[in-house]
């Protein structure tokens, strides 16, 4: 588990020999900054750039043109200090790290997840909320995020409604989830379409993801809510 490896302070960073994870944590009051089960790392530490460079080289060799960057908020967390003494705030650290990201991945389509809304000029798209899967509650969650976050497609090129997952869901749930993605502006298929993937899921995908008239609606623009002043959220 990547979280368990990353949260072992004495573990050497495999990709960057000579550094241990404890060397790159962001500390507040002497303790590692933790959020959502993972420790934040210092974007100004040399090992952070080295890992970006190494990963970028791998992705470019493999021919990838798209990269999803997750848990970006960790890079904006406040700390007692940063490796680079010129950095004094979390957002300064985030900007520093994002400039490196642009340096190594700037020729790719970058999709940010769990990230600050601003600064926004380092990526083409940003996930409009957190994880949304395949059930009706996930559709409700996405629509709630769209109701109050539609304007972000004026900040980024695209709002990302999270991957559309069809497996283990009813036809009605599939249709609703596809709709929630289409009206957000784009959607990304999230099931396993490899040779070993589920035949049922592939059939569902052919049924729900190949409707030309529906797909034409997903043109990168988010729908605007008729009423944006509601007082209740999903499931209420």
Task: Please give the residue ranges for each predicted region.
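Short, small-residue-biased leader/transition segments that mark boundaries at the very start
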Residues: 2-3
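Glycan-recognition surfaces
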Residues: 11-50, 54, 92-199
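Active-site cleft segment of glycoside hydrolase catalytic domains centered on the general acid/base Glu
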Residues: 77-91
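Active-site groove signature of glycoside hydrolases
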Residues: 52-81
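Non-catalytic C-terminal accessory modules of carbohydrate-active enzymes
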Residues: 195-236
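Short secondary-structure transition/capping segments
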Residues: 8-15, 79-83, 122-124, 203-205
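Short hydrophobic/aromatic residue motifs in ordered secondary structure
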Residues: 73, 187-188, 211
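Conserved beta-strand edge residues that scaffold enzyme active sites
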Residues: 7-8, 73-74, 117
């Amino acid at each position: 588990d990547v979280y368990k490896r990353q949260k072992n302070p004495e573990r050497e960073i495999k990709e960057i020999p000579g550094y241990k994870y404890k060397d790159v944590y962001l500390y507040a009051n002497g303790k590692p900054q933790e959020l959502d089960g993972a420790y934040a790392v210092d974007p100004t530490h040399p090992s952070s750039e080295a890992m970006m460079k190494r990963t970028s080289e791998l992705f470019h060799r493999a021919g990838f043109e798209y990269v999803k960057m997750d848990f970006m908020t960790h890079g904006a967390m406040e700390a007692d200090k940063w490796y680079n003494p010129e950095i004094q705030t979390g957002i300064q650290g985030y900007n520093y790290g994002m400039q490196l990201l642009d340096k190594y991945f700037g020729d790719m389509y970058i999709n940010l997840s769990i990230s600050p809304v601003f600064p926004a000029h380092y990526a083409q798209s940003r996930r409009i909320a957190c994880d949304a899967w395949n059930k009706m509650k996930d559709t409700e969650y996405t629509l709630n995020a769209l109701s109050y976050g539609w304007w972000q497609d004026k900040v980024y090129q695209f709002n990302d409604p999270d991957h559309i997952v069809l497996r283990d869901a009813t036809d009605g749930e599939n249709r609703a989830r596809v709709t929630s993605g289409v009206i957000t502006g784009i959607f990304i298929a999230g099931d396993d379409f490899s040779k070993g993937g589920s035949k049922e899921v592939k059939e569902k995908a052919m049924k729900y993801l190949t409707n030309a008239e529906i797909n034409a609606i997903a043109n990168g623009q988010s729908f605007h809510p008729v009423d944006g002043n509601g007082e209740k959220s999903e499931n209420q």
